[in-house]
Amino acid sequence: MSSNKASFFTRLRRLCRLAVWLFKTGKNLRGIDGGCPESRNRAVIELGRGVLAALDIGLEVGRPAPEHPNGVLVAANHVSWLDIFAMSAVYPSSFIAKQEIKSWPVLGKMGQNAGTVFINRNSRRDIEPINRAVCETLQRGQNVSFFPEARTSSGLGLLPFKAALFQSAIDAGAKVLAVALRYYDETGKRTARPSYADVGLPTCLWRIVSMKKLTIRVDFVCVADAAESEDRYALKDKIEESIRAVVADDADIAV
């Protein structure tokens, strides 16, 4: 009977390639610090693709991103630390991320150079200044991505969205792009193994490199005009419902 896990050699090779990628990236972080938007976007795309390639992770784009100007607030469901790299590989942007990531080796510095806004999820006092910062970033024509669930899920369903950070799109008069992320194993079935909702980063990474094959599917679901929403709650509901429908689409065949 064949194992449904990658061989130990494959796991070790993937970890070694990730270590090499981290080392090389750590020496060239200035590529995403400053410069023109085009060069910064290219650097962000390369970072996203580099991590996925090192770990042998496939990337599929289901519904493509619609044509729209820059300065878009991107909202996605949150499953794994891989979410950021998958999204960056196809749609470069800054991110709103939890404060703990700022201290992560290499990845924290990458986030800072890419313009990531780090937030304390336990402090409501952070919301107003964060919304101002995101609004200003959107008005400069830079895309900003965030995860309105505010924490990771199994990826087979959706946690309730938080409405607070949608206010930045309303204040900026920006568009909001809904993105659905789904993870599949080597059999083509949905999987929750890449999630770190209930495990730490080392365990999550080991689960990922242990999979025979992992594919991330990115669907750009819809675009909402924040100016047409009654308030941030109505805007949140529209985006949440659109993502929930896609995430639930084939979750019944998950393993």
Swiss-Prot record:
Membrane-topology annotation of the record: Peripheral membrane protein
Compartment annotation: Cell inner membrane
Transmembrane segments: none
Matches recorded under CDD domains: LPLAT_AGPAT-like (cd07989)
Cleaved signal peptide residues: none
GO CC terms: plasma membrane
UniProt key word Secreted: no
Motif (HXXXXD motif): 78-83
GO molecular function, one term: 1-acylglycerol-3-phosphate O-acyltransferase activity
Matches recorded under SMART domains: PlsC
Catalytic activity: a 1-acyl-sn-glycero-3-phosphate + an acyl-CoA = a 1,2-diacyl-sn-glycero-3-phosphate + CoA
Keyword annotations: Acyltransferase, Cell inner membrane, Cell membrane, Lipid biosynthesis, Lipid metabolism, Membrane, Phospholipid biosynthesis, Phospholipid metabolism, Transferase
Record's comment describing the protein's domains: The HXXXXD motif is essential for acyltransferase activity and may constitute the binding site for the phosphate moiety of the glycerol-3-phosphate.
Name under which the protein is recorded: 1-acyl-sn-glycerol-3-phosphate acyltransferase
Gene: plsC
